[in-house]
């Protein structure tokens, strides 16, 4: 798999449904692992202290790709936090808003593109990854493609916390 072929500007995009799929769960898992390691390098933190938030839109392939990316993050040794269905701005704002403040985030979406496509948008505290930063993640993913996961991080969901918060405010 040539990960650079998934590049669409500063995002990753590919066919996620049907024959000829290029953005598969295995690819999303490798990209999650690569992004966790990229963020660790950028923040200077050990990967075991890195946390990455994940969200998705309503596309049919979203839940599977989000879960795969979360598994990749955890297999790198980092913490993956599943925000479930949310907006792209929410994934960036999660990094900046007091409270959890993950070190990075991934939004699983293909924006306005046809339903069979999907993609990944990557964010750090500086904003969405730029063209060259995405190249770093894709090159890292390429080098990790055959690597077996060694570390085990954690995958958590915000859904329980949100439900509890909703109950206490009524």
Please describe what each predicted stretch is:
Residues 1-69, 75, 157-170:
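An N-terminal, well-structured beta->alpha segment
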Residues 7-8, 13-16, 86, 121-123, ...:
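Generic, ordered loop/turn and secondary-structure boundary motif
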């Amino acid at each position: 798999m040539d990960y650079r072929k998934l590049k669409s500007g500063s995002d990753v995009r590919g066919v996620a449904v049907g024959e000829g799929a290029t953005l598969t769960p295995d690819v999303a898992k490798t990209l999650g692992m690569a992004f966790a390691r990229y963020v660790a390098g950028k923040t200077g933190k050990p990967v075991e202290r890195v946390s990455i938030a994940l969200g998705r839109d309503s596309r049919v392939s979203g839940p599977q790709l989000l879960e795969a990316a979360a598994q990749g993050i955890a297999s790198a040794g980092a913490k993956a936090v599943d925000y479930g269905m949310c907006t792209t701005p929410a994934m960036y704002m999660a990094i900046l808003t007091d409270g959890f403040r993950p070190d990075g985030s991934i939004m699983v979406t293909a924006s306005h593109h046809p339903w069979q496509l999907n993609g990944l948008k990557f964010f750090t505290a500086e904003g969405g990854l730029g063209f060259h930063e995405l190249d770093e993640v894709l090159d890292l993913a390429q080098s990790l493609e055959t690597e077996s996961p060694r570390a085990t991080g954690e995958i958590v969901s915000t859904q329980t916390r949100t439900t509890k918060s909703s109950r206490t405010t009524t």
